Curated annotation (Swiss-Prot):
The keyword Lipid metabolism applies. This is (7aS)-7a-methyl-1,5-dioxo-2,3,5,6,7,7a-hexahydro-1H-indene-carboxyl-CoA hydrolase. The gene is echA20. InterPro entries: ClpP/crotonase-like_dom_sf (IPR029045), Enoyl-CoA_hydra/iso (IPR001753). Keywords: Cholesterol metabolism, Lipid metabolism, Lyase, Steroid metabolism, Sterol metabolism. CDD domains: crotonase-like. Pfam families: ECH_1. Involved in the final steps of cholesterol and steroid degradation. Catalyzes the hydrolytic ring D opening of (7aS)-7a-methyl-1,5-dioxo-2,3,5,6,7,7a-hexahydro-1H-indene-carboxyl-CoA (HIEC-CoA) to (3E)-2-(2-carboxylatoethyl)-3-methyl-6-oxocyclohex-1-ene-1-carboxyl-CoA (COCHEA-CoA). Gene3D superfamilies: 2-enoyl-CoA Hydratase, Chain A, domain 1 (3.90.226.10). Belongs to the enoyl-CoA hydratase/isomerase family. GO terms for molecular function: lyase activity. One of its GO terms (biological process) is fatty acid beta-oxidation. It catalyses: (7aS)-7a-methyl-1,5-dioxo-2,3,5,6,7,7a-hexahydro-1H-indene-carboxyl-CoA + H2O = (3E)-2-(2-carboxylatoethyl)-3-methyl-6-oxocyclohex-1-ene-1-carboxyl-CoA + H(+).
Length: 258
């Protein structure tokens, strides 16, 4: 359980996330994930990274139960800093990162996938940001890298999911395969990258990031500022408490009137 890394003789490092039952990652886990990805990129024997997960789904975001069990804002700050570190690590990793998405990818998972270089997904995979149903904001920056602008806004405001097939149509998911073929597919793509001259590939990663029209790190931190505002106003706790108690979004009937 936790974050593990393995490197094979072909220059492929596989980073695996395993936090049963749904891969809702605790604060410490986000920092460990960031370290694992960055360490892989620093290793001269690593030519490409595969980021994958065990279990029912790729990622369920932050561990909300951990956050609600902690007094004050310490857990929130840790979770936000951890997410920012992990998202940035995928983006800044010195070699390309291939993500293999199984089942579901929501919340913080979108930040990881949106900052990756190559995305492959199982044919049952869904992607989404339930943030507004949790009284929070964040990762619109990364969702906007997966879908067109107005689709991003619609998905964000409604907290609806989008399928792997839809993302493939938009050009963000490279390949959609049956779940049992997901790991092999990710490895096949990674092997093609690993076979190239790693000196050129490392320069290519840095160059492509350099021409990116959006500063994904600054943009995401701006979003997090509004999450803090919602927390200071008490709105976020209302939503998180109801989610922890019922497993469902806060009812619209609880909206303040007037």
């Amino acid at each position: 359980m936790g974050i593990t890394s393995t490197t094979d003789g072909d220059g492929i490092t596989t980073v695996t996330v395993d936090y049963p039952p749904v891969n809702a990652i605790p604060s410490r886990g986000w920092f460990e994930l960031a370290d694992a990805v960055l360490d892989a990129g620093r290793n001269p024997d690593t030519h490409v990274v595969i980021l994958r997960a065990e279990g029912r789904g790729f990622n369920a975001g932050v561990d909300i139960k951990e956050m609600q069990a902690t007094d004050g804002y310490g857990a929130l700050v840790d979770a936000n800093r951890g997410c920012a570190a992990a998202f940035a690590a995928v983006y800044d990793c010195a070699v390309p990162v291939v993500v293999a998405v199984n089942g579901f990818c929501v919340g913080g998972g979108i930040g990881l996938v949106g900052n990756a270089d190559v995305i492959v997904a199982s044919d049952d995979a869904v992607f989404g940001l339930p943030e507004v149903d949790r009284g929070a904001l964040g990762a619109a920056t990364h969702l906007a890298r997966l879908v067109p602008q107005h689709m991003m806004r619609t998905l964000y405001y409604t907290a609806q999911n989008v399928t792997a097939q839809q993302l493939q149509h938009f050009g963000s998911v490279y390949e959609v395969v049956p779940r049992e073929k997901l790991d092999d597919t990710a490895r096949d793509i990674a092997a093609k990258i690993a076979a190239k001259d790693t000196r050129v590939i490392r320069c290519a990663k840095e160059a492509i990031n350099g021409i990116d029209p959006v500063d994904v790190k600054t943009s995401y931190r701006l979003e997090q500022g509004y999450t803090f505002e919602l927390n200071l106003a008490g709105v976020s706790d209302e939503h998180r408490d109801e989610f922890v108690e019922t497993g469902k979004p806060r009812s619209h009937s609880n909206n303040r009137k007037g």
